[in-house]
């Protein structure tokens, strides 16, 4: 998430096995703008950008993994942009449930509504409508 006018704005969810790289840091060597909040007990492994770049140079398989990771992140960013511009809040909710079937059991509704770009009241209405 990041902050807009002192309010948390969620723009990404991760799950087991996902890699977390602030792309601003990885590619521009600048501090990222995002904050990471773990909602469940987790184990994290840290790898410096310099070490990752060394691994890219040392192993083509790791370099290809990094390229594919970046490609997936670009696609996710584009999908989020398209979703926010052209889909209704109901469609965005349905997409989220399709992508993360157990999200309602794992993430507070306030965070989900932030991700969808709607109020928690609007989210409650959507959920009531499709029950």
Task: Mark where each language-model region is.
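Short, Lys/Arg-enriched, Trp-marked, Pro/Gly-tolerant hinge/linker segments that flank
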Residues: 77-88
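Short, well-structured alpha-helical segments
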Residues: 67, 71, 91-94
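Cyclic-nucleotide recognition modules
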Residues: 9-68
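Phosphate-/nucleic-acid-contacting segments
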Residues: 87-131
């Amino acid at each position: 998430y990041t902050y807009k006018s002192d309010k948390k704005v969620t723009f990404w969810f991760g799950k087991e096995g996902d890699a977390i790289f602030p792309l601003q840091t990885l590619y521009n060597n600048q501090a990222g703008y995002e904050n990471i909040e773990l909602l469940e007990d987790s184990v994290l492994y840290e790898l410096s950008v310099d070490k990752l770049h060394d691994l890219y140079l040392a192993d083509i398989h790791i370099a290809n993994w990094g390229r594919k990771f970046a490609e997936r992140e670009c696609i996710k960013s584009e999908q989020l942009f398209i979703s926010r511009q052209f889909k209704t809040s109901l469609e965005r909710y349905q997409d989220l449930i399709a992508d993360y079937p157990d999200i309602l059991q794992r993430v507070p509704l306030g965070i989900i509504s932030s991700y969808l770009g709607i109020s928690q009241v609007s989210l409650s209405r959507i959920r009531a409508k499709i029950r």
